[in-house]
Amino acid sequence: MKFGIEFVPNEPIQKLCYYVKLAEDNGFEYCWITDHYNNRNVYMALTAIAMNTNKIKLGPGVTNPYVRSPAITASAIATLDELSGGRAVLGIGPGDKATFDALGIEWVKPVTTLKESIEVIRKLLAGERVSYEGKVVKIAGAALAVKPIQKAVPVYMGAQGPKMLETAGMIADGVLINASNPKDFEAAIPLIKKGAEAAGRSMDEIDVAAYACMSVDKNADKAKQAAVPVVAFIAAGSPPVVLERHGIDMEKVEAIRNALKSGNFPEAFKNVDDTMLEAFSIYGTPEDVVEKCKKLAEMGVTQIVAGSPIGPNKETAIKLIGKKVIPALKE
């Protein structure tokens, strides 16, 4: 089992660098930084992190092919790989409609756009001059003047829906799945496998990552309470098929959605129940978290990404995961 950590760059980058260096020193192998226009710029954050770390692999988790052209993303990743001494990874997904609506960007054919963009990015990173006439992506003789250190920078696809998961199985080096519960991987992994088999690939070639809401503390109740706000947002944004899979009370979810819309956060958080917490987070003492992670490993998960909130105290949680969780999952 590999272990990664995810950060939203919503606080000073110096602080982010401190946390990632701490994670590196505590055995984390991957660092994923989210890419949203309203937070600190993902590539500026990754540049600073690269210059303050030595071993940890790092990349956007995840960017998308709409806000930047594939050539701009390829250039950024090649530069990050050079700067980090060959540690770059690329996490790229379809993005979300709400963000694109706010930015006035049309969300066209997400599966096709992502597939074509990855193909173009890989060609550019390989040093090719690219002329490409896809259904969505068009490139006319573009080439990079910078080359990555790695022969092939690993490409991880952010995927949730059936078509996206199948496509990831066909083309991606890894899949980043926003999920914390074995039931979600029971549904997702057969779809990845189907895509892999269609492309003549083995599942051994694909790193299946659980992009999990994690909250770790010596005090299980404190860990649980810290997960509540994140779980509220996950529940509010989950499609009916996911809510039904976990037997979640739809009335409570509707109450959470309405409360979040009106900015009444205490009311939203009050409606988060244990069923939601079990479905959408990995929380508890290090021992609790180890047991939950083992169940994900049994389903075929090969990387656990500790995502927000990580714990009631980030520094303490990173150290606890490094000392108690990672070693137990490496046995």
Curated annotation (Swiss-Prot):
The keyword ATP-binding does not apply. Its main location: cytoplasm. GO terms for molecular function: coenzyme F420-dependent N5,N10-methenyltetrahydromethanopterin reductase activity; oxidoreductase activity, acting on paired donors, with incorporation or reduction of molecular oxygen. Pathway: One-carbon metabolism; methanogenesis from CO(2); methyl-coenzyme M from 5,10-methylene-5,6,7,8-tetrahydromethanopterin: step 1/2. One of its GO terms (biological process) is methanogenesis, from carbon dioxide. One of its GO terms (cellular component) is cytoplasm. It is found in: Cytoplasm. Keywords: Cytoplasm, Methanogenesis, One-carbon metabolism, Oxidoreductase. NCBIfam families: F420_mer, PRK02271.1. Catalyzes the reversible reduction of methylene-H(4)MPT to methyl-H(4)MPT. This is 5,10-methylenetetrahydromethanopterin reductase. The lineage of its organism: Archaea, Methanobacteriati, Methanobacteriota, Methanomada group, Methanococci. The gene is mer.
